Design a protein with these regions (language model features):
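Short microdomains enriched in Cys/His and/or Lys/Arg
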Residues: 43-63, 80-95
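Short Cys/His-centered divalent metal-binding micro-motifs
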Residues: 27-34, 43, 55-79
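Short flanking/linker segments adjacent to small metal-binding domains or redox-active Cys/His motifs
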Residues: 82-117
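Short, charged surface segments at domain edges that flank catalytic/cofactor-binding sites
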Residues: 1-21, 46-56, 94-95
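Short cysteine-rich loop/turn motifs with clustered Cys
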Residues: 6-37, 60-65
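Charged/polar, solvent-exposed surface patches and flexible loops
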Residues: 12-16, 75-80
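Terminal targeting/leader modules
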Residues: 3-4, 9, 41, 46-47, ...
Length: 117
């Protein structure tokens, strides 16, 4: 397995948490999740961090949403916790998911973040 990649166990946790639906949902979303997105990118040294391959660092997304996150709008993605800066702990960064702010854990669970947007 590539350093920082999601294991089959973690991918299963991400899919269970998402229910098979895209967790980002920008305009043009296909709804069905087909890819695992790293909130804290693996580049720039991120793949060496043990947190990179954990469920708190992942979101299940559809292709259009993944392309949006990776190429179009990094500012919005950071503001919504869909992308996390290197050095940050994804477990501590709220993410906007299904119209609410949540914190993700490494077991594939989530809890309300108490963020007022």
């Amino acid at each position: 397995m590539t350093a920082g990649a999601f294991s089959d166990v973690v991918r299963a946790r991400l899919m269970a948490r998402s229910g098979g639906f895209c967790e980002v949902r920008v305009p043009g979303c296909w709804d069905e999740a087909s890819q695992a997105h790293h909130r804290r990118p693996r580049g720039l040294g991120g793949s060496r961090s043990p947190q990179t391959g954990q469920a708190s660092n992942g979101l299940m997304v559809c292709l259009p949403c993944h392309q949006h996150l990776e190429t179009v709008e990094r500012g919005e993605a950071r503001d919504r916790g869909w992308i996390v800066r290197q050095g940050a702990d994804p477990r501590e960064i709220p993410v906007y998911r299904y119209r609410q702010w949540v914190l993700l854990d490494d077991e594939g669970g989530l809890s309300p973040a108490g963020v007022v947007a």
